[in-house]
Amino acid sequence: MCDDDETTALVCDNGSGLVKAGFAGDDAPRAVFPSIVGRPRHQGVMVGMGQKDSYVGDEAQSKRGILTLKYPIEHGIITNWDDMEKIWHHTFYNELRVAPEEHPTLLTEAPLNPKANREKMTQIMFETFNVPAMYVAIQAVLSLYASGRTTGIVLDAGDGVTHNVPVYEGYALPHAIMRLDLAGRDLTDYLMKILTERGYSFVTTAEREIVRDIKEKLCYVALDFENEMATAASSSSLEKSYELPDGQVITIGNERFRCPETLFQPSFIGMESAGIHETAYNSIMKCDIDIRKDLYANNVLSGGTTMYPGIADRMQKEITALAPSTMKIKIIAPPERKYSVWIGGSILASLSTFQQMWISKQEYDEAGPSIVHRKCF
């Protein structure tokens, strides 16, 4: 592929929380913005303000005080196609400033995505945006590429969904994939709830964004939850303060680690599921006995919800406790893991061997949207 931006492939990782988009071959996404579509709650009264009927991404975020914010992607799966189209339109025309009809486009999807969902994505890309070629790749597999491996088990935890995906020699093993509908957004909700216990009230969609910021800046994973709780109760050494947009300062203590602890103990938010360490172990146990050793030695973390300080050590401790005692266990936590899905997509789309994998407009016209199941696995 040429080096100029004229025919370069585009890579768009549509997460539940953030859209990461850019050009194949780059080492980081050029555009990262929230997957939000906002609509005004009030009637416009000033003439000539050029008010729009909807706002996308950062613009929606900055005007959140007067908007109702909606996320079109829930639990990694697109639920609102009209809003999703707005997000893609915004990605191509406003963020990347490209004409989609000139660029092959690589999209990502959650593992175990419904079939109808992939078809609809394919259809919108070819019929609404007229892309010349496209491909849909599984997010966790791309994260593994980004870490330079072809075998390993990926814990991909984003804003909407968490997966354990074992990959062997580049193939995801679908029977062993574990999906957990517990991720960053649920942790934000839980933090909103436990802050209410302290007497701080966060209710609106705009206030939720403030809590998300508190979570990202102050939360961490405790190595030993009970010990940490005791420390928090007996001293104020773990307390941190945070200034709200209106200048009010709030203090948070054990909430800092109680919030992400939910990943290991989903019962905190009333979920019956096993924690992320157990789902990782269960996923490995569903794989062939001969490849387990390779999976234990290559636990790759990916996604924004794995960015908490202390999470790798805690995973190491928990999986070591579950695994056979002689097993070598390694948790790989790349520093750029927030964007590793996108980076993997960028690597994949710029490989010369990948160029015959694209679904072309011609193939789509001949076979229709179902072509995606034949060409993208």
UniProtKB/Swiss-Prot annotation:
GO MF annotation, one: ATP binding
Stored Pfam families: Actin
Post-translational modification N-acetylaspartate, affected residues: D3
Cellular component, GO annotation: cytoplasm; cytoskeleton
Residues with the N6-methyllysine modification: K86
Location of the protein in the cell: Cytoplasm, Cytoskeleton
Record PTM Tele-methylhistidine, positions in chain: H75
Enzyme Commission number, as recorded: 3.6.4.-
Source domain of life: Eukaryota
InterPro entries: Actin (IPR004000), Actin/actin-like_CS (IPR020902), Actin_CS (IPR004001), ATPase_NBD (IPR043129)
Function of the protein: Actins are highly conserved proteins that are involved in various types of cell motility and are ubiquitously expressed in all eukaryotic cells.
Protein name: Actin, alpha skeletal muscle A
Source species: Takifugu rubripes (Japanese pufferfish)
Classification lineage: Eukaryota, Metazoa, Chordata, Craniata, Vertebrata
